[in-house]
Amino acid sequence: MAGQHLPVPRLEGVSREQFMQHLYPQRKPLVLEGIDLGPCTSKWTVDYLSQVGGKKEVKIHVAAVAQMDFISKNFVYRTLPFDQLVQRAAEEKHKEFFVSEDEKYYLRSLGEDPRKDVADIRKQFPLLKGDIKFPEFFKEEQFFSSVFRISSPGLQLWTHYDVMDNLLIQVTGKKRVVLFSPRDAQYLYLKGTKSEVLNIDNPDLAKYPLFSKARRYECSLEAGDVLFIPALWFHNVISEEFGVGVNIFWKHLPSECYDKTDTYGNKDPTAASRAAQILDRALKTLAELPEEYRDFYARRMVLHIQDKAYSKNSE
């Protein structure tokens, strides 16, 4: 059975009150149009960003192919001055390059010290902060990070989930975003937080037969659009044009639920991590049994988890 292809709903002129009281509790992706983002959507041209962003050194992903794979790491990390990154990312062919003349670039901005500081565009790029308004769709104390993203045209980012809620602000350019529900995790062939299925448009169903069952939610983002991505929703992003985006991440759960060492917003909540460690110990204990018994008691455990932990709410 082929999975459903569903459009992500779009709404225009949503107020803070509408979002927080009626839309946010639904925990579903949503494209918001007509949000006041400040002058960034018209000001952030290649020339302007190069001039204002200056020579600040940034760490980037460089890939010889458009389809980036975090599992096999088919890219390298390099450092460039910000102005050079912007100019190179806007090009199709490069006179100067690291890997090949048609290599792709991807910036995911970091904190000053990524081991202890979260990304915040207002701190790392202070001359740009006056150009952009963050939608006030969460309480200030819930704020986690704001991440600057710059992508070459055609670049595809692997399917993954984040543990924070986020707003993806498409400042310039155009992106296609495909999302999958957390309820469809069993069809996505996960390795950690990421899916092994790279080619989501033409997947190898002999290798990944269950992928066809995953429901696919899709939207196109243009300059000024804002996509709400709830925590745990998987997303795959293609930059159809050179573009600049900003992600704003915030905490859906109380702060004490999150790993305090997490500066990226992608470590599972501490209770989930503890449960996974307990499960690993249980599996080692099960391994002491012969296969026939191990299989039987593993199935009983799965049924017990489904009964006690799966949500009874239908989507």
Swiss-Prot record:
GO cellular component: cytoplasm
Signal sequence annotation: none
Domain called JmjC: residue spans: 102-267
Cofactors required: Fe(2+)
Database matches in SUPFAM superfamilies: Clavaminate synthase-like (SSF51197)
Main function: tRNA hydroxylase that acts as a component of the wybutosine biosynthesis pathway. Wybutosine is a hyper modified guanosine with a tricyclic base found at the 3'-position adjacent to the anticodon of eukaryotic phenylalanine tRNA. Catalyzes the hydroxylation of 7-(a-amino-a-carboxypropyl)wyosine (yW-72) into undermodified hydroxywybutosine (OHyW*). OHyW* being further transformed into hydroxywybutosine (OHyW) by LCMT2/TYW4. OHyW is a derivative of wybutosine found in higher eukaryotes.
EC number: 1.14.11.42
Name of the protein in question: tRNA wybutosine-synthesizing protein 5
Gene3D superfamilies (UniProt xref): 6.10.140.1470, Cupin
Lineage: Eukaryota, Metazoa, Chordata, Craniata, Vertebrata
Annotated keywords: Dioxygenase, Iron, Metal-binding, Oxidoreductase, tRNA processing
Binding site for Fe cation: 160, 162, 235
Phenotype upon changing residue 108 to A: Abolishes enzyme activity and ability to bind tRNA
Keyword tRNA processing among UniProt keywords: yes
Family: Belongs to the TYW5 family.
Cofactor note: Binds 1 Fe(2+) ion per subunit.
Top enzyme class: oxidoreductase
GO biological process, one term: wybutosine biosynthetic process
Catalytic activity, as annotated: 7-[(3S)-3-amino-3-carboxypropyl]wyosine(37) in tRNA(Phe) + 2-oxoglutarate + O2 = 7-(2-hydroxy-3-amino-3-carboxypropyl)wyosine(37) in tRNA(Phe) + succinate + CO2
Known partners and oligomeric status: Homodimer.
InterPro entries linked: Cupin_8, JmjC_dom
GO MF term list: iron ion binding; protein homodimerization activity; tRNA binding; tRNA(Phe) (7-(3-amino-3-carboxypropyl)wyosine37-C2)-hydroxylase activity
Listed pathway(s): tRNA modification; wybutosine-tRNA(Phe) biosynthesis
